[in-house]
Structure formats: C-alpha cells, structure tokens
C-alpha cells in the first residue's frame, strides 16, 4: 500500500455536509483495508483567487495509506460531487501524522480523535 495526502475544497454552502462526505470517504478507505493517518478539518478559509465567483471554501486534509485503485475511486467521487470545487492528491514516501502547518496558532478540528485541538504557534 502507498501513502497519499489529499486536500479537497468544498463549496461554502455545503459546509454542513462535510462530516457526511468525510464519513463516506473514510468508509471507502476502510473497506479496502486502508488506514487514515491524519484527518483535519481546516474549516472555512479565504481562497487565494475566486473559483466560480466564490471567495471562501471549506478545506479538508487527509493522509491515508491505501491502494492506487481506492485513490482512483476517491478522485472519481470528488469529480462527480458538485460540492467539491477542487481536490489535490499527492503520493508521499511515508505516513504523516503530526499536525499540519496550516493549523499554526488556530483552533482546528482533528476529525480522527473528534476533539478540537489548539496548535501552538512557533
């Protein structure tokens, strides 16, 4: 199995649907005996540039270990889900479990533990 980092951006009007989407994707990974090493909900953030006249979006980060077939299935699900504005999948060499730099000093939600965490800005 290979390691991947996935970030997807959800339309701000669909922010309430993000937990259900994440659960669906977690199920797809678990059914293929994959592992989720890191799952973070970055919340609504300002986009660097407007996408379809939208200036803010809901961000989610996942670090997973699974087969390439499951990643293709996830990307197909992203493509056919109109709520997902953009997605990016990167193959990594090893599992990443520490908090991402995007969380620096801000309150964010780690979806694996289900608890809110306060990251310390350095």
UniProtKB/Swiss-Prot annotation:
GO terms for molecular function: small ribosomal subunit rRNA binding; structural constituent of ribosome. The keyword rRNA-binding applies. One of its GO terms (cellular component) is cytosolic small ribosomal subunit. GO terms for biological process: translation. Keywords: Ribonucleoprotein, Ribosomal protein, RNA-binding, rRNA-binding. The keyword Ribonucleoprotein applies. It comes from the Bacteria. Pfam families: Ribosomal_S6 (PF01250). Belongs to the bacterial ribosomal protein bS6 family. Binds together with bS18 to 16S ribosomal RNA. PANTHER family: MITOCHONDRIAL 28S RIBOSOMAL PROTEIN S6 (PTHR21011), SMALL RIBOSOMAL SUBUNIT PROTEIN BS6M (PTHR21011:SF1). This is Small ribosomal subunit protein bS6. It comes from Neisseria meningitidis serogroup B (strain ATCC BAA-335 / MC58). The gene is rpsF.
């Amino acid at each position: 199995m290979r390691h991947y980092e996935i970030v997807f951006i959800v339309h701000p009007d669909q922010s309430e649907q993000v937990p259900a989407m994440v659960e669906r994707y977690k199920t797809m990974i678990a059914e293929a005996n994959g592992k989720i090493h890191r799952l973070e909900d970055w919340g609504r953030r300002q986009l660097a540039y407007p996408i379809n006249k939208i200036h803010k979006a809901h961000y989610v980060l996942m670090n997973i270990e699974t087969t390439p077939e499951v990643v293709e299935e996830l990307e197909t699900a992203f493509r056919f889900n109109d709520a997902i504005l953009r997605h990016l999948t990167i193959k990594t060499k090893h599992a990443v479990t520490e908090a991402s730099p995007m969380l620096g000093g801000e309150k964010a939600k780690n979806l694996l533990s289900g608890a809110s965490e306060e990251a310390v800005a350095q």
